[in-house]
Each structure stands twice: as C-alpha cells, then as structure tokens.
Regions:
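Conserved GNAT acetyl-CoA-binding A-motif
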Residues: 84-100
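Conserved beta-strand in the GNAT
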Residues: 29, 33-45, 57, 62
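Conserved catalytic-core motifs of GNAT/GCN5-like acyltransferases
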Residues: 94, 109-126, 214
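Active-site rim helix/loop that mediates acceptor-substrate recognition in acyltransferases
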Residues: 2-32, 45, 193-194
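Conserved acetyl-CoA-binding loop-helix of GNAT-fold acetyltransferases
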Residues: 63, 69-82
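Local sequence-structure signature of Cys/Sec-based thiol-disulfide redox active-site neighborhoods
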Residues: 143-179
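A short, internal acetyl-CoA/4′-phosphopantetheine-binding micro-motif in the GNAT/acyltransferase core
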Residues: 59-68, 96
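Non-catalytic, surface beta->alpha helical segment in thiol-disulfide oxidoreductase systems
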Residues: 209-236
C-alpha cells in the first residue's frame, strides 16, 4: 500500500490477519497492484456482533478502481461460496444504500443474498442460504444499542482490521479535540469477545458523540467539521 499514512497500520493489519488465520480466516487477492481481495472466516470467529452459527462471514470484500466490472469480484465471491460448501450459508454486513467501507447491497443481492436482519441506524445483515432449515443469522442485541456508557464528547471504537484506523485515530482525533475543545476517547477492541459484544454493527471503526452513534466512516478533522452542526441538531 503506497499511502505513507497507512504504513504502520499495514503492519498492524498483517499481525491481525496472522492471528485470524489460526481461526479459519481466508484471504484471497488478485495478483495485481490494486485493492482486489476478499476476507472471510467462520462467523463464530468474526469480529462482529452477529449470531450466525455454521455460517461463513465475509469480513472484507474490495474491488477498486479500474478492476471493477471485469468479473474479478464475482470470481472472488465464487471462491468464498466454494469454500463454504457444507455450511449453512454466507453472511455479510452492508447498508440499504451505498456507503464507504461497506460492500454494496445491490451486488450481494445480484448474487443471491437477501436481508435477514437490520441494526440502526442503517446497517443490514445479508445472507446467502445453503441450508433452508438453518436458523437465520441475526445481529446481536449489542449491535442495536448504538450507545456507549461514556456519554461525554467523542468516543471512537476501532480495531486493526483496517490499515487506516491506526493513523486516523491518532493525529486526526487530536486535531478534533483541539479545535472543538471536546473530550476524545479512543477504545481499541483487541479481542474477538470485545468485538462480538460491541455496540455497533461495524467494529472496524465507529464514532459516538455524547454516547450515541454518529458514523462508521473514519473521521478526519474536515469530516468532523461537516458533522458538527448536525450533531447539535440531533442531540440537542
């Protein structure tokens, strides 16, 4: 990855992946200089608050730039389907509309997925079922809380699943704290158990303001500037 801001985060992500390989995670990437890859693992070991026994969970699925529309995504998804033979099905987290860091719902639907549960404010759990008699996957209740106990200022929950979170939970949050004079707290989820009981459906990065969820998008000072007025309106 060429982005210098992510260099340390890439090392952390590799360490995170190495530990997950022991828990059944599969990482497959197109042999090209681009972000074309898929990660999946047994849902029981996913770092997400879902209840999906005997399902495969797609942890990250990314086809970027000029590689879109060439069938690479379909090939990678087919690899996941093939590796999931004998399972109850495959699950993934998406949204009712296109959002950063979430694979598009329309793509999953085109490949036989359907919505089986939702979590506020906009998350959807999608499933491709192989066993019609298996229980449908569900978000855990914690994913639907969308609140944290620390109700003062900005709280960011994050993991090393994304190579960008390390940088953007550092200097960028410092800049927000200094500019707005609000408390900023970082909470790094370091175990599967913490992630599986998180108060958000997206454990890679979730931001809470005055105790309530505001976004899963990685915040910069510029992004927070745009959020500031809406935060006052929604929580006033």
């Amino acid at each position: 990855m060429s982005d210098k801001k992510a260099q340390h985060g890439v090392s952390l992500k590799k360490e995170w992946l190495a530990c997950r390989f022991q828990e059944g995670l599969v990482f497959k990437k197109l042999d090209a200089n681009g972000k074309v890859f898929i990660e999946y693992l047994p849902a029981e070991n996913a770092w997400v608050p879902v209840d999906a026994p005997n399902y495969t969970f797609i942890n990250c699925f990314w086809v970027s730039g000029s590689y879109k529309g060439q069938g690479y995504g379909a090939h990678l998804l087919q690899e996941c389907i093939r590796d999931s033979e004998g399972k109850a099905g495959i699950v993934a987290v998406s949204s009712h509309k296109k959002r950063p860091y979430l694979s598009e719902k329309s793509y999953y639907v085109k490949h036989g997925f359907e919505v089986c549960d939702t979590a506020p404010p906009y998350f959807e759990l999608l499933v491709k079922r192989f066993d019609p008699d298996a229980p449908l996957p569900r978000f855990k209740e914690s994913a639907k809380q969308q609140t944290v106990a620390d109700g003062n200022g900005l709280v960011v929950l994050y993991t090393d699943q994304c190579p960008f979170t390390d940088h953007y939970t550092g200097d960028e949050l410092d800049a927000i704290e200094q500019a707005y004079g609000i408390p900023v707290k970082r909470v790094k989820l370091t175990t599967k158990e913490q992630a599986q009981n998180a108060p958000s459906a997206f454990t890679t990065y979730s931001a809470f303001y005055n105790g309530r969820f505001v976004t899963h998008e990685i915040l910069t000072k510029a992004k927070f500037d745009k959020l500031w007025n809406t935060l006052g309106e929604s929580q006033g």
